[in-house]
Amino acid sequence: MQQRRPVRRALLSVSDKAGIIEFAQALSARGVELLSTGGTARLLAEKGLAVTEVSDYTGFPEMMDGRVKTLHPKVHGGILGRRGQDDAIMEQHHIAPIDMVVVNLYPFAETVAREGCSLEDAVENIDIGGPTMVRSAAKNHKDVAIVVKSSDYDAIIKEMDANEGSLTLDTRFDLAIKAFEHTAAYDSMIANYFGSMVPAYHGESKEAAGRFPRTLNLNFIKKQDMRYGENSHQQAAFYIEENVKEASVATAQQVQGKALSYNNIADTDAALECVKEFNEPACVIVKHANPCGVAVSTTILDAYDRAYKTDPTSAFGGIIAFNRELDAETAQAIISRQFVEVIIAPSATEDALKITAAKQNVRVLTCGQWAQRVPGLDFKRVNGGLLVQDRDLGMVSEAELRVVSKRQPTEQELRDALFCWKVAKFVKSNAIVYAKENMTIGIGAGQMSRVYSAKIAGIKAADEGLEVKGSAMASDAFFPFRDGIDAAAAVGVSCVIQPGGSIRDDEVIAAADEHGIAMIFTDMRHFRH
């Protein structure tokens, strides 16, 4: 039999009150004595529950505006006391055992995320007594249950009912792990916040705070184990951030199909992030982390049809992302035309899911609609270190563009230029994208020489019989030589959009003028490695 411990006395002190009333009522109904502090105690008393204030229990009042509430031997002795070993000393000092501690911590992350949060506000939201109780209870998990997540309330009551008011050691150990994870994440947030302020605090920077802390503490939660990683000899798992607000592959719900692989997740992320760039109904098809077809139209069906035409060969076994609900007609077009690994969309109709269900290997994910892009950090692991940078959310508006050629772009060329510029951001460098009438017609990705990416994009368009004449070309970075412009002109490109900034910009612009090409500078680069 598991080492059960009956729950006779519980201390409840929570910042997040979700579910606490019902949980406290369930504990009380099972004969558990309730201790509590401050606002939690008042809330429970208002609901008619018999609750003892910790200050009454210890005989010592809360003080210093609530900074000192639970830091008392009667509290921590009751939590840390080892049953069967410390009984005599506990009895001598009138310390009653506390069998369960229910605590979640001051909302530090929410506080510092608020605009205008001062250092004083942040400091006052650093919990002291809470983490101390959490760690004490987790340390003594052989005798005490520590509860830090409201999502565990129902399971705890269910287990108590199955074990005559007791919890097993396995459960207490699992709860202790969650508790240490909780306090580690909490302390990491505080360390990151203060670490980012070190230069400014010591007068080493004119900025209010640095973007990157002195020590970077990261906390991710394992969502799933993978069968293997990028290759079959590599073990892997998928970890996600807690409380992600933006629709993403990490928050998406899989509504159909077998488990996602490591490569599925990476490619789905690439497809979804690309399709988010567009306001019109859009489709992005990705293969090996690169878009192989992108289009916008009046419907996602037409957008898919046009994206597929860019490169049907590469689309086989690809990932398809939409920025509108997946409907039955589009689902049918996909299933009848190609093999697809993953389809991701904000939502999917029931009829669409019935159609995709006919193909058991097709994974369908719904991620919800996204209102806005959320700034964050990108990470790249190198041997012995971690490169950290802001997410590339850089965008350019039509008003920010600079036409540097003699010829001005037509309205259609300008639309196509802005369209393929958005796509180029998600193509591996060196990236070249040809587009015409809101669809990609050729994509050159990942070449060591930019001119070869331009040539490949032209070859891809020719292979599919797509008309390049009058198209726009986007380059993720500047052209170091005029050869890329010459290659584009040779296949009929009439407009080029690029960041500019080369020491040979004059030569490159002159090449555009020679060929009658309109050239636009964005003054923003989008390397992707």
From Swiss-Prot:
Domain of life from the UniProt record: Bacteria
Taxonomic source organism: Salmonella dublin (strain CT_02021853)
Pathway(s) served: Purine metabolism; IMP biosynthesis via de novo pathway; 5-formamido-1-(5-phospho-D-ribosyl)imidazole-4-carboxamide from 5-amino-1-(5-phospho-D-ribosyl)imidazole-4-carboxamide (10-formyl THF route): step 1/1; Purine metabolism; IMP biosynthesis via de novo pathway; IMP from 5-formamido-1-(5-phospho-D-ribosyl)imidazole-4-carboxamide: step 1/1
Location of the MGS-like domain: 1-148
Keyword presence, Hydrolase: yes
Name this polypeptide is given: Bifunctional purine biosynthesis protein PurH
EC number: 2.1.2.3, 3.5.4.10
Family: Belongs to the PurH family.
Reactions that this protein is recorded to catalyse: (6R)-10-formyltetrahydrofolate + 5-amino-1-(5-phospho-beta-D-ribosyl)imidazole-4-carboxamide = 5-formamido-1-(5-phospho-D-ribosyl)imidazole-4-carboxamide + (6S)-5,6,7,8-tetrahydrofolate; IMP + H2O = 5-formamido-1-(5-phospho-D-ribosyl)imidazole-4-carboxamide
Any GO BP annotation: 'de novo' IMP biosynthetic process
One Gene Ontology term of the molecular function aspect: IMP cyclohydrolase activity
Keywords: Hydrolase, Multifunctional enzyme, Purine biosynthesis, Transferase
GO CC terms: cytosol
Entries under SMART domains matching the protein: AICARFT_IMPCHas, MGS
Domains: entry comment: The IMP cyclohydrolase activity resides in the N-terminal region.
Annotated InterPro entries: AICAR_Tfase_dup_dom_sf, Cytidine_deaminase-like, MGS-like_dom, MGS-like_dom_sf, PurH-like
UniProt gene name: purH
Keyword Transferase: yes
